[in-house]
């Protein structure tokens, strides 16, 4: 076999090796229904379901700027609910964990962190605002990290009955809320509490936030396509 024939043979084999996975991706991407991993829904008593069966109730608490934040004002965003106080003994460790989330998604307007104060009497608007400004100075968008205070009894009742966090002494529990107000994950200090999760709490939460952000992107894509189809119909 001549050298030219050998080269043609090698080029042909290389082309087949490249073309086969490409055709496989096209076949399964176009002819099959695309699915991606998503998260279950978390309800009272840590019950899990594939369909939404619990939605956090509405709330109305003042943020660090004195503006009222509600559940409905967060619809359309994926957000982390954290419960602690700026006067907590382990505030540095708690903040460090949330800073990882904040920095990872600092340029994503659809991702937010919301702190529910566990000591409303000591968390003044001034201290809350200073805390937020210090930790969000590199954010690409404002209002990505909110600090809520208000009536102490009302706040604690909401944390227990709304966010389903019974132990208010454990500041290291975070809840992941999707764009519709459903709880999709619970994360602890070092242990990843949510069943079927991705591992360690913060890396696991980073991955899970990406999954819920994908849900938003797919929903918007489908809505845009439906709108385009409606406008092109005779």
Model-derived segments and spans:
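Thiol-/selenol-based redox modules, centered on thioredoxin-like
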Residues: 169-234
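Short, small/polar residue-rich loop motifs at catalytic or cofactor-binding pockets
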Residues: 54-56, 168-171
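Structural microenvironment flanking redox-active thiols in thiol-disulfide oxidoreductases
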Residues: 94-148, 152-158
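N-terminal targeting signals for export/organelle localization
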Residues: 1-58, 232
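Short active-site neighborhood of thiol/selenol oxidoreductases, capturing the structured segment around
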Residues: 69-98, 113-114
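Second-shell loop/turn segments in exported
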Residues: 85-87, 116-120, 144-145, 191-196
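Hydrophobic beta-strand positions
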Residues: 60-61, 176
């Amino acid at each position: 076999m001549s050298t030219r024939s050998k080269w043609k043979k090698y080029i042909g084999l290389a082309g087949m090796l490249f073309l086969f996975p490409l055709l496989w991706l096209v076949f399964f991407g176009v002819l099959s229904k695309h699915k991606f991993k998503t998260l279950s829904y978390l309800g009272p008593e840590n019950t899990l379901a594939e369909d939404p069966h619990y939605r956090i109730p509405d709330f109305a608490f003042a943020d660090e700027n004195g503006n009222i934040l509600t559940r409905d004002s967060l619809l359309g965003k994926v957000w982390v609910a954290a419960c602690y106080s700026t006067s907590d003994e382990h505030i540095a460790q708690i903040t460090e964990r949330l800073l990882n989330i904040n920095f990872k998604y600092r340029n994503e307007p659809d991702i937010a962190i919301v702190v529910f104060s566990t000591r409303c009497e000591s968390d003044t608007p001034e201290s809350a605002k200073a805390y937020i400004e210090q930790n969000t100075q590199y954010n690409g968008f404002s209002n990505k990290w909110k600090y809520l205070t208000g009536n102490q009894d009302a706040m604690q009742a909401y944390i227990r009955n709304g966010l389903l966090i019974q132990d208010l002494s454990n500041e290291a529990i975070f809840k992941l809320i999707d764009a519709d107000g459903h709880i999709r994950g619970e994360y602890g200090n070092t242990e990843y509490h949510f069943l079927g999760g991705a591992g360690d709490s913060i890396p696991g939460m980073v991955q899970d936030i990406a999954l819920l952000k994908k849900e938003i992107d797919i929903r918007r894509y489908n809505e845009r396509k439906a709108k385009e189809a409606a406008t092109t119909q005779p």
